[in-house]
Regions:
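Rossmann-like adenosine-cofactor binding region
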Residues: 271-360
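Glycine-rich adenosine-cofactor-binding loop
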Residues: 186, 199-205, 214-239, 252-253, ...
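Adenosine-phosphate binding glycine-rich loop
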Residues: 197, 323-392, 406-453
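Intrinsically disordered, low-complexity terminal tails and inter-domain linkers enriched
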Residues: 35-38, 47-57, 61-65, 198-220, ...
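NAD(P)-binding Rossmann-fold cofactor-contacting core
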Residues: 243-268
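Low-acidity, Ser/Thr- and Arg-rich intrinsically disordered low-complexity segments
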Residues: 4-5, 12, 16, 20-22, ...
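N-terminal ligand-binding/catalytic initiation module
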Residues: 41-46, 51, 56-178, 185-187, ...
Length: 453
């Protein structure tokens, strides 16, 4: 057989390798090595000192063989979130969120909607309050039929990432967070968009400290449409706001659910809060109401423009997709329209989309809550500054729409709106602000379960 080149090289080199080995064998006994010079190559003695001496005799610690501590993930259950996300924490988080949005600091990509069977929809949000803030995502769904099965209509999970490393630091149940952040944002809107002057009310006073209402009938008259978790949350936020609440009326399609809510309210309401009166129709609930919170998942309007008094604030939180419109376009046409986020509302708020398609609303007249808050904050120390609230007896809140009557023209020729509409879709920035606040509150209180990643 032919011999390969590699084999020939090996055979040729063998005599030279043998001669070199013989020389090394002769020299080694004459030059014994310093054991310290090879200590780094030798395994440590079992049970002995594993530290290595350097050439100067100094002892240096060995390089740690342990891996860095594995990061942990804080898990917050619904009960954990309820404990940490108090009314004060919720309100502060939402006020800060909209201020950041109004200043242009927040990072808010478009949300994702994934339709399902019937009216079911899955959603995904992501946002951060600023570039150096934690990134937060929320993935969940809305299943209106869950109510009949005794389950919440909304389920979600929220994840918070470390702003420096991107490592997930917290994951929390998102149902309570979504409910409370939505209602807290409505409370922020109520404080910014409604005043006693707008409704011609002279019997409404600023609430003291804990002040939640006036049970003698004076104070803000609130109407709640719907009987789900948002209805209850909005009632709680209303009585915890800056103005006293004198009356709460409730109207809902589901009478049994409404009865349960009223019974629960009478036993758990904050001290000093007024009774919740259950009425038969939405029209009855809206009669003389200063603030109307529409908290349904209806795809069609649930109230009429003629039921809403001049100067009222209508809060709509159920039209979170283009196919849902709980407020009629003729009422939108008469309103100053304020939304949580302009781009989101123009694409996905059913009330806004329907009014745009009907030609009774122009995109340029739509304001955002963040813009209002930033503008008002800038003018807070200027008593003569325009606060975008019409304060005479014949009008209401500020910069308008094109559906109001010409007879309502303001000093600069604008058409004054008859009412104000806060139309909320819900945005990821609200979740980001809420989740970070919940995580911080939970860590301070020692709430939650650490999990290894």
């Amino acid at each position: 057989m032919p011999v390969s080149n590699h084999a020939m090289i090996f055979v040729t080199a063998m005599p030279r390798l043998a001669a070199s080995a013989a020389k090394i064998a002769v020299l080694l006994p004459l030059c014994p090595p310093d054991p310290a010079s090879f200590s780094s190559l030798m395994p440590p003695r079992i049970g002995g000192d594993s530290r290595a001496a350097n050439r100067d005799g100094a002892v240096t610690p060995p390089r740690s063989s342990e891996e860095p501590a594995a990061p942990t993930l804080l898990y917050l259950s619904e009960s954990d979130v309820r404990a940490a996300f108090t009314a004060d924490v919720a309100h502060a988080s939402q006020h800060a969120a909209f201020i950041a949005l109004g200043r242009g600091e927040a990072l808010l990509p478009a949300r994702l909607l994934l339709p399902g069977r019937g009216d079911d929809v899955a959603f995904c949000y992501a946002a951060r309050a600023e570039a150096s803030a934690p990134a937060v995502s929320k993935f969940g769904s809305v299943h209106a039929g869950n109510v009949d099965a005794g389950l919440p209509a909304v389920h979600a999970l929220v994840t918070v990432l470390d702003p420096t490393t991107g490592v997930p630091t917290c994951v929390m149940a998102g149902t309570t967070l979504t409910t409370r952040r939505t209602a807290a944002a409505s409370a922020v809107a109520m404080e910014a968009l409604w005043s006693p002057d707008s409704s011609g009310r002279d019997d409404v006073r600023v609430a003291d400290g804990a002040g939640v209402g006036a049970r003698d009938g004076t104070g803000v008259h609130v109407a709640i449409v719907g009987s789900g978790v948002q209805a209850e949350a909005h009632a709680l936020c209303a009585v915890g706001g800056e103005h006293t609440v004198g009356r709460i009326r409730l109207a809902a399609r589901d009478r049994a659910s409404a009865d349960e809510l009223v019974a629960r309210w009478h036993t758990t309401r904050p001290e000093g809060a007024p009774d919740m009166e259950l009425v038969d129709t939405v029209e009855q609930a809206c009669a003389d109401a200063d603030v109307i919170a529409v908290c349904t998942t209806s795809t069609t309007p649930v109230l009429e423009a003629t039921w809403v008094r001049d100067g009222a604030l209508v809060i709509s939180v159920g039209s979170f997709s283009a196919e849902r419109s709980e407020v009629p376009s003729d009422l939108v046409a008469q309103a100053r329209v304020v939304v949580d986020d302009r781009e989101t509302a123009l694409a996905d708020n059913g009330c806004v989309v329907a009014a745009l398609m009907a030609g009774v609303l122009e995109t340029g007249s739509v304001e955002t809550l963040g813009e209002v808050l930033v503008r008002d904050a800038a003018h807070a120390d200027d008593d003569d500054a325009e606060r975008h609230v019409w304060n005479d007896d014949s009008s209401n809140n500020g910069v308008t729409n094109h559906g109001a009557a010409d007879s309502d023209a303001g000093a600069h020729g604008e058409r004054r709106p008859r009412v104000t509409l806060y139309a909320s879709v819900g945005i990821g920035l609200q979740d980001a602000a809420a989740a970070v606040a919940v995580q911080e509150a939970a860590q301070r209180a020692g709430v939650g379960t650490p999990l290894p990643l």
